[in-house]
């Protein structure tokens, strides 16, 4: 793939346009969360006002178990989007992932694009997670990645494994051979917690088994399952590349979010776990956390509000958090720990 910052910036803008204006959700695959019921307790002994949504992730306190998911960076509009997202995150006390910082690795023109990731001024206290692709995470790139993280004031690094997205992308990075070893080496060299994530096609049991077979065991500090059922980046890339859907089966391929949560949590009982991929409501979040996630991440539903204003983002998220609070209250959970203890019921 080209490393030209101008080409990367143009592609990022096309991603934004497609996500705003086209149907990019999975069609034949759901998150699987609808197959679970959060138990309703008519005799709850909780007070809605006393429900505690606080959480901790990578050692950072959060007022609610929510991260704003990775969206964009490098396009002209990205700066506005990211600053509005970060401002809302600061106001609500939640975390935020940046979009891919690949463009910042370019020594020449990437410096100009770096401003689109500069959010610390408006979000000094936010858990901020940087972002780079697994295909770009070579040992040689580690110093540049570390510099990019320092420049934006990140607390951690998300590494996105996106083989299907890259296969659909014009000129995409399609050589993932040796990427597990590179991930291990980079995680050892970086002085940051590393979060391994997908982009909407899911991390499940098979991927975790590969990670655990590496010398030294699990090389990352946490996992974001980024499951299927929400935005399909295979679909997005086809629409960007061809203007149409040429491979519909590939647009609907992935591990549903609920399935991914269960598989990863069973294999890794104590590893920090993010549930993302089609998380659209407070009820979705409650089910995901009851299944074993520590926090949830939300991305595309916040894109249009983020173009409008930080207040619009905050308003969307406040409704989401209000619903999550009611879910805990009406199932009898005072906090997230008791929510996990209550769990969910599979619908047969």
Swiss-Prot record:
- Residues binding FMN: 70-72, 100, 131, 197, 231, 278-280, 299-300
The listed locations are:
Cytoplasm
Q: Which GO terms describe its cellular component?
A: cytoplasm
Role played: Involved in the biosynthesis of isoprenoids. Catalyzes the 1,3-allylic rearrangement of the homoallylic substrate isopentenyl (IPP) to its allylic isomer, dimethylallyl diphosphate (DMAPP).
Instruction: Output the HAMAP family linked to this UniProt entry.
Output: Idi_2
Subunit details: Homooctamer. Dimer of tetramers.
Q: What is this protein called?
A: Isopentenyl-diphosphate delta-isomerase
Q: What organism is listed for this UniProt entry? A: Mycobacterium marinum (strain ATCC BAA-535 / M)
Instruction: Quote the gene name from the UniProt entry.
Output: fni
């Amino acid at each position: 793939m080209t490393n030209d910052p101008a080409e990367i910036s143009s592609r990022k803008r096309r991603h934004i346009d497609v996500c705003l204006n086209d149907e990019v959700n999975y069609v034949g695959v759901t998150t699987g969360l609808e197959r679970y019921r959060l138990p309703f307790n008519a005799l709850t002994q909780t007070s809605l006002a006393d429900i505690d949504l606080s959480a901790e992730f990578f050692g950072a306190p959060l007022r609610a178990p929510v991260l704003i998911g990775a969206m964009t960076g490098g396009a002209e509009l990205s700066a506005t989007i990211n600053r509005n997202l970060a401002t809302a995150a600061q106001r609500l006390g939640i975390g935020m992932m940046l979009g891919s910082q690949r463009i910042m690795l370019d020594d020449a023109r990437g410096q100009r694009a770096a401003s689109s990731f500069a959010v610390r001024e408006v979000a000094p206290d936010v858990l901020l997670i940087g972002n780079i692709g697994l295909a770009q995470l070579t040992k040689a790139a580690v110093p540049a990645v570390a510099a990019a993280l320092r420049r934006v004031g990140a607390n951690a690094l998300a590494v996105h494994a996106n083989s299907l997205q890259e296969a659909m992308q014009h000129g995409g990075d399609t050589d993932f051979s040796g990427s597990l070893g590179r991930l291990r080496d980079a995680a050892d060299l970086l002085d940051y917690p590393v979060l391994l994530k997908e982009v909407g096609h899911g991390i499940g049991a098979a991927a975790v088994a590969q990670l655990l077979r590496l010398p030294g065991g699990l090389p990352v500090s946490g996992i974001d399952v980024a499951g299927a059922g929400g935005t399909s980046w295979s679909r997005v890339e086809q629409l960007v590349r061809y203007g149409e859907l040429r491979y519909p089966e590939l647009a609907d391929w992935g591990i549903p979010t609920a399935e991914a949560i269960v598989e990863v949590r069973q294999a890794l009982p104590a590893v920090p776990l993010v549930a993302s991929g089609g998380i659209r409501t407070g009820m979705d979040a409650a089910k995901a956390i009851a299944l074993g996630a520590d926090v949830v991440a939300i991305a595309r539903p916040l894109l249009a509000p983020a173009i409008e204003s930080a207040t619009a983002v905050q308003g969307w998220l406040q409704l989401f958090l209000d619903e999550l609070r009611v879910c805990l209250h009406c199932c009898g959970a005072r906090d997230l720990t008791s929510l996990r203890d209550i769990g969910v019921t599979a619908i047969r």
